[in-house]
Amino acid sequence: MNGAELPIFSGFYRVLSRYAPRSGVSAAVIFIASLMLLLFAGADRAVAQIEQEEPDVSPTLRTFDPVSQLVVAKTQLTRAKFPVIDVHNHFGFRFKGDREGLEQYVGIMNSNRIVVAVCLDAVLGSEEAHLKFIGDGNEKKLAAFVHIDFKGAGNREDPKTLACNQLGFVRQCVEQLRVAKTRGILGLKFFKSFGLTELNADGSLIKIDDPRFDPIWKTCGELGLPVIIHTSDPAAFFQPIDNKNERWEELSRHPDWSFHGDQFPAREELLAARNRVIKRHPETTFIGAHFASSSEDLATLSKWLDEYPNLVIEFASRINELGRQPYTARKFFIEHQDRILFGTDGPWPDLRLSYYWRFLETFDEYFPYSEDSPQPQGMWRIYGIGLPDEVLKKVYHENTLRIIPGIKDRFLQAADAEENNNK
């Protein structure tokens, strides 16, 4: 067989045969050249076929979910060591009126030794509807804070129509707070939208320390209603979503959680404005939600606690941050043991709650902080901080009984009921 007998190269062979003699190229050279082209073409077709039959199975960051090969102690905890008050829950937003779901979670509370849970979803001025939802037999176990509806019947496309920009809005809020307390409301909640997305009539962002809201802060102090305030968010949420961002995987799934860009205030600006409010109202107790949004920087948070005696903190959805710095976190919890409340951002399933107990009560190493896989708030594991019993009791309930006076009766009744059930 020669090159002329290979159909795919017959044309090429005829060209070479016609012009090769003029240049002194032999038939053997023509044959070898044809054969080499044939081999290359066959290799290309083979590679293409392999690629088609065996697609790339290399893991991506989205699918990377390694199983640890560490062989370390795993303490199995199914309930807290002491009775717990959880000050940060969202039964309204999560259950959306589903009584069955709420009742199921009350069962989870009982099995985990959460004797009282505070829901932050009641709307100021219409709190009775939410109180009815979480009540109906659960009055001893569930309590509520209210939050302010800045939008009302208005349209965000026309900020002048928003409730917060109507004449007498602050005065109305003050009056509603007084009524809410008589109905059993225990405090006021501010969401992170206050400072990040709530608008003035001219379309500019409302500043957290705007003096027009001073009567609200002042009234809470007069009524003994603590203010749980969520300002800003994790530091990574204010950074570009790029290969340097430690929460890239999370933000790539939820780009709307990012506050990077000129349209948002700087994180430091938001926290400074919040701190000015805390300083301006020393008679009002402020609960810094999510460790006052400084769980990545406990040294700075420690300075705030020293500077503002009316500030306490809770760590809902922040064991992911605290548990990756166990030495620093343990020292912080012990140093500020009178200023820390327990919160989860629940309702959560049993497994998520068990990670809270392991984090606080054990020295377990390198374990998940969430039942979700991959881990949802940073692709890492956490370590336990093994708090002493006297500190655990303060974090679990003693501090909250002091900070939220209206919760004491519920706690005592629920704790007594739990003790009787265990006899």
Features from the language model and the residues they span:
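Active-site gating/metal-coordination segments in enzymes
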Residues: 53-62, 127-257
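Acidic-and-aromatic substrate-binding clefts and catalytic sites of carbohydrate-active enzymes
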Residues: 92-101, 119-129, 151-155, 163-171, ...
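An N-terminally biased module of ancient metal coordination in phosphate/nucleic-acid-related enzymes
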Residues: 49-137
